A protein has these predicted regions:
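Short hydrophobic beta-strand segments that form the core of ligand-binding sensory/regulatory domains
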Residues: 55-57, 76-80, 120-126
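N-terminal low-complexity or simple alpha-helical regulatory segments
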Residues: 1-73
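Generic structural motif
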Residues: 58-63, 82-84, 126-130
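Glycine- and acidic-residue-biased ligand/ion/polar-headgroup-sensing regions
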Residues: 71-90, 127
Length: 181
């Protein structure tokens, strides 16, 4: 089981993904299926360029707001909210909301998903882990090793938990990703 924003999006996961579910699968990955506040959901885990990624697909059945904060070109922190929220209130709204680091092809920062849309994004690592590891990390390679050993449930991020040390590591990771692409 895994909790999503506001603890209202409980998904009970199971390995069998229905054939009707849209979207492609990651090669050599385990897929888990569930249902919850936003509709159907598939979570996958696989390695891309040596990093352990979670690739999640939501088949949206309710109106959902996505708010993305840019970290660097192509890399964002995404907040998934049920309903429609004004960005001017984001500081209050997002204080205790789960967020995710994700890759987006364009610079959209706030958009609404209607019923029937899909939402796909990649989860990388938990801010909680970053805060714990930050004082001891000298090189990105060490960080990569820690991420590969991170348990499945550590992929959740929390908006209020980002410290300066965590931000430094995120920035280092993002700049490294840009150089390698």
């Amino acid at each position: 089981m895994r909790y999503y924003p506001h603890n209202k999006g409980l998904f009970i996961l199971r390995k069998q993904v229905p054939k009707h579910f849209p979207g492609r699968r990651m090669r050599d990955s385990k897929a888990y299926y569930g249902q919850g506040a936003w509709g159907e959901y598939v979570s996958q885990a696989g390695r891309i360029s040596g990093f352990l990624f979670g690739y999640d697909v939501f088949n949206i059945t309710v109106q959902t707001s996505l708010f993305c904060k840019r970290l660097s070109p192509g890399v964002s922190i995404m907040y998934m909210l049920k309903g429609s929220f004004a960005i001017s209130n984001s500081a209050q709204v997002l204080k205790n909301v789960n967020c995710y680091i994700c890759y987006l092809p364009r610079g959209e920062t706030n958009y609404l998903l209607e019923e029937g849309h899909q939402c796909c994004f990649s989860l990388l690592f938990s801010v909680g882990n970053l805060n714990t590891l930050a004082p001891n990390i000298e090189k990105l390679q060490t960080f990569k090793d820690h991420i590969q050993q991170a348990p499945e449930n550590s992929r959740l991020l929390f908006a209020g938990a980002i410290t300066k040390n965590a931000r430094r590591i995120i920035d280092a990771f993002c700049s490294n990703e840009q150089e390698s692409t």
